[in-house]
């Protein structure tokens, strides 16, 4: 019975897993199909849209070009037709517009010859009056002279002050001497040595307890326990029904004599299964399995608070006195000379900012002291 139950459970689990796999396969296939369908639609729709937009742009460009060509052609025809008329008539049209002019065009108009030029003859001396109208060829009109100069505009606001300029170069006066009381900026001080480190701060507070590590791997299973005691024998099964009667055998001839008893017949078929027996006792508890591997260590705690600021370092050595270098004079004057600090020769020579680039270090820096 137990084996049958296990087999049924395995069959059910296999059937369930198979049905799940089929469902997952169907869902995956549908997703792939929709993705391919969308990709195909995009691949087909984008070229069609691009072709439609390109055709629209081309059509608009052609229409615009046609309109421009037609516009230019129209005004070119008007321009060439204007050139066929006389210069005076074109100038009058440009000045007063296309209108019927009255008056003498030239001196010959007084004798009646002006009628052949499109003017209505009038008395000699009449002036030509009329408001300027739209010319027949606005694209070819000659621009008039520039108008009078307009009035000056409102003065603008003053601009922002510019950036300060760089300091100029010092003057070059021959035989210039440096004044004794001239205030000059002292040379930059040498970098002082670092002070002693401060007192070590208090240790920070301990960090929070890290999260528990993940569970360790499963330990090795212990050995199987000893088999339990055999359960009691179940009750006998139900007795089977009687078999069908066999065919009658042939009647022997002659006198009947009883023969010896025959051999024992084969056992009958197995009867129906009996009632299940009582469950047996549980076996002995197996030994304890081996200890699992240790879990991963937790994260480190937060850093502690910073310690208090250390005390200020000691005062550095005093700086060197200022120097004044005069131009065109081979001497260096000391301003307010005082006690000179004792500096090692190697430290002084290694500094390029004092005497190192002026040829000679300490000896060259104080060579002209007290000499003019």
From Swiss-Prot:
Q: Give one GO molecular function term.
A: structural constituent of cuticle
Keyword tags? Collagen, Cuticle, Disulfide bond, Repeat, Signal
Where does the record place Gly residues bias? 237-246, 283-292, 353-363
Residue ranges, annotated region (Disordered): 144-372
Biological process per Gene Ontology, one example term: regulation of gene expression
Query: Which segments cross the bilayer?
Result: none
Q: Read off the PANTHER family from this record.
A: COLLAGEN (PTHR24637), CUTICLE COLLAGEN DPY-10 (PTHR24637:SF351)
User: Could you give the subunit structure recorded for this chain?
Assistant: Collagen polypeptide chains are complexed within the cuticle by disulfide bonds and other types of covalent cross-links.
Name it: Cuticle collagen dpy-10
Species of the source? Caenorhabditis elegans
The gene it comes from is dpy-10
